[in-house]
UniProtKB/Swiss-Prot annotation:
Minor protein of the capsid that localizes along the inner surface of the virion, within the central cavities beneath the L1 pentamers. Plays a role in capsid stabilization through interaction with the major capsid protein L1. Once the virion enters the host cell, L2 escorts the genomic DNA into the nucleus by promoting escape from the endosomal compartments and traffic through the host Golgi network. Keywords: Capsid protein, Cytoplasmic inwards viral transport, Disulfide bond, DNA-binding, Host endosome, Host Golgi apparatus, Host nucleus, Host-virus interaction, Late protein, Microtubular inwards viral transport, Phosphoprotein, Viral penetration into host nucleus, Virion, Virus entry into host cell. Belongs to the papillomaviridae L2 protein family. This is Minor capsid protein L2. The gene is L2. It comes from Human papillomavirus type 26.
Length: 472
């Protein structure tokens, strides 16, 4: 184990130590000689100074200040000393004093003389006061009727540019006769143009017509969501409630409305989730339906907020939650399919016919054949019903089969094959040619050469209902 050395602290200067430790007697041995000038170098200079004069050279153990007189430069003449003289002050103007004016300046102006007081007037009369009484015969009535004044009425008209009241035009009496001529400056003959109308919605289209006036060229492929990346944690959810109510796995709340095809966000809280696999989930992205390993899979990406920094940034892993809805079984395991009859007969006594039976061994239930002519077509007298239990006489119609195109002839109990084929006019077969895949009916366009440069790519697995976050 390597020992760690303590950091070295710088000691105070010798001058500071000498001030505090000289009186206490705790100074280090190198402080007092350095301050008092009793070091070995100082003693050597003192001993050598007894025989050699070194004054004025500034040789010593102190700072290099050149002694009391300073360093004297060698060589060169001395420069004249320049004394800076400041600007001269303006002179003080002294006002002259005349011979008749006093030399003493008075500080307070002269004021008028104030009398000490006026004499008190004297009254002459009898003893006491004289009282005089009087009675008024006129009642004190105040006239409160206001005086008639002049009233001035003024009016001001202000026009508001935001609202101008439309003026009211008084209808005037006009002429009612039949000779009224109206002429305008734009009167004249105007021509018109016939524009042919085109049908935009055609029933004979191929379905590949562009739906906009400027279609986007090329083929745009939507990249499949990378749900099985190494950066995602794979968690399987066995509860089918994950499809309809995914929030029940994150929080204990039961919202009234929860969209199942959108991204769900949750507030980060310290409470424990109902399902431990959904702990610290703050977002569940839109679902995606995929097919993987023979099953239909329902997937959602979840974002966790395991850590939160002081700046507010949340850090967490991305988890892929998936639930297998149903397995996809191959057709080889279910080759035998039992077919149920769509119509059942209520009459079990009706005879059944075998379409592969020999017509010679079938009991004769038909009437003699009718001759066929090209101009007449026999019509049956009664309709033949296999499931009919009514005993009625039936008549079959013989229709000759044409063998010009080498059609296969089938026989059965209800199909009669004639022994001699009628004579039909022979028609030459149409010439067989190999039709190309693309037929060009004109020379006013050409195929885009870039079609031949498109390479086939590997077919990817189909994905549906993925949002932007899942796709990338």
């Amino acid at each position: 184990m390597v020992a760690v050395r303590a950091p070295r602290r710088k000691r105070a200067s010798a001058t500071d130590l000498y001030k505090t430790c000289k009186a206490a007697g705790t100074c280090p041995p190198d402080v007092i000689p350095k301050i008092e000038g009793s070091t070995l170098a100082d003693k050597i200079l003192q001993w050598s100074g007894l025989g050699i004069f070194l004054g004025g050279l500034g040789i010593g153990t102190g700072t290099g200040s050149g002694g009391r007189t300073g360093y004297i430069p060698l060589g060169g003449g001395g420069r004249p000393s320049v004394v800076d003289i400041g600007p001269t002050r303006p002179p003080i103007i002294i006002e002259p004093v005349g011979p008749t004016e006093p030399s003493i300046v008075t500080l307070v102006e002269e004021s008028s003389i104030i009398q000490s007081g006026a004499p008190i007037p004297t009254f002459s009369g009898g003893n006491g006061f004289e009282l005089t009484t009087s009675s008024a015969t006129t009642p004190a009535v105040l006239d409160i009727t206001p005086s008639a004044g002049t009233v001035h009425v003024t009016s001001t008209n202000i026009q508001n540019p935001l609202y101008i009241e439309p003026p009211i035009d008084i209808p005037q009496a006009g002429e009612a006769s039949g000779h009224i001529f109206t002429t305008t400056s734009t009167a004249g003959t105007h021509s018109y143009e016939e524009i042919p109308m085109e049908v935009f919605a055609s029933t004979n289209g191929t379905g590949l017509e562009p739906i906009s006036s400027t279609p986007i060229p090329g083929i745009q492929r939507v990249s499949a969501p990378r749900l099985y990346s190494k950066a995602y944690q794979q968690v399987k959810v066995t509860d089918p409630n994950f499809i309809g109510n995914p929030s029940t796995f994150v929080t204990f709340d039961n919202p009234a409305y929860e969209p199942i095809d959108e991204t769900l966000t949750y507030a980060s809280s310290s409470t424990v989730a109902p399902d431990p696999d959904f702990l610290d989930i703050i977002a569940l992205h839109r679902p995606a339906l995929t097919s993987r390993k023979g099953t239909v899979r329902y997937s959602r990406l979840g974002q966790k907020a395991t850590m939160k920094t002081r700046s507010g940034k949340q850090i967490g892993a991305t988890v892929h939650y998936y639930h297998d809805i149903s397995p996809i079984q191959s057709f080889a395991e279910h080759e035998e399919i039992e077919l149920q009859p769509l119509h059942t007969s209520t009459h079990s006594s009706a005879p059944l016919f075998d379409i592969y039976a020999d017509p010679d061994t079938v009991p004769s239930i038909h009437t003699p054949r009718m001759s066929y002519s090209p101009t007449t077509l026999p019509v049956p007298r009664y309709a033949s019903n296999v499931f009919s239990s009514i005993n009625t006489s039936t008549t079959n119609v013989t229709v000759p089969l044409s063998t010009s195109f080498e059609l296969p002839v089938y026989s059965g109990s209800d199909i009669y094959t004639p022994t001699s084929s009628p004579t039909w006019p022979s028609l030459p077969p149409p010439p067989t040619t190999n039709l190309p895949a693309i037929v060009v009916h004109g020379d006013n366009y050409y195929l885009w050469p870039y079609i031949y440069l498109i390479h086939k790519r590997r077919k990817r697995m189909p994905y549906f209902f993925s949002d932007g976050f899942v796709a990338y």
